[in-house]
Regions:
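C-terminal SET catalytic tail plus cysteine-rich post-SET Zn-binding segment of SAM-dependent SET-domain
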Residues: 93-191
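Catalytic cores of histone-lysine modification enzymes
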Residues: 2-99
Length: 191
């Protein structure tokens, strides 16, 4: 019997940013495919925000920590099963992330990534829930301090990140179908 395993490219490990993170097992070139993105596997359902009242507390915590929000609802994991989270769900946020999305919604390298480096992406590349707000712990030089579901609407943010935004947000941005664009403000970080 001849058994062939898929080459290991990424793995979980302890993170300085958020407890657990995803790390490169090999080096990646700019725009190189890293892993299947959330758009392909997890956009099968949209759970409306009105449904959240019927969901138990443990699941609500998982939704808050793992799911991407939209103005209408959130995108749950495949088969609505938080016991089946893939490695990619553990990619931490950084305002200067080294990962983005390609036109198919897969994770790709935004720049050269060295073996052993933590993979991070700016959650504003995917998050569009206008009520989303997260204090940032990334520590990058360009840290915005607070990440919101409206950051993607900022013209400067879009200019810098459009090619790496989740395809759904990229299409909305290119068509100009959003209102209330406000500049992203840098917030002084507490030390």
């Amino acid at each position: 019997m001849n058994v062939t395993f898929t080459k290991v490219r990424i793995e979980l490990g302890p993170s300085q940013i958020g407890g657990i993170g995803v790390f490169a097992v090999i080096s990646f070139r700019e725009n190189e495919y890293l892993a299947a993105g959330i758009a392909k596997t997890d956009y099968k359902h949209l759970v409306r925000w009105t449904e959240i009242a019927r969901i138990d507390g443990d699941i609500k915590d998982k939704i808050r920590h793992f799911c991407i929000g939209t103005p209408s609802g959130f995108i749950p994991p495949d088969k609505l099963d938080f016991n089946r989270l893939t490695v990619e769900w553990y990619i931490n946020h950084s305002c200067d992330g080294n990962v983005g999305f390609n036109e198919d919604g897969d994770f790709v390298a935004r720049r050269k990534i060295e073996k052993g480096e933590e993979l991070t992406y700016d959650y504003a590349l995917a998050e569009s829930n206008p009520r989303f707000r997260m204090e940032c712990n990334c520590g990058s030089a360009g840290c915005r301090g607070v990440i919101t579901g409206n950051d993607w609407k900022d013209p400067e943010f879009r200019e810098k990140n459009l090619d790496y935004m989740l395809p759904r947000l990229r299409r909305v941005s290119e068509a100009g179908r959003f209102a209330g664009a406000k500049p992203v403000r840098a917030v002084a970080r507490r030390r």
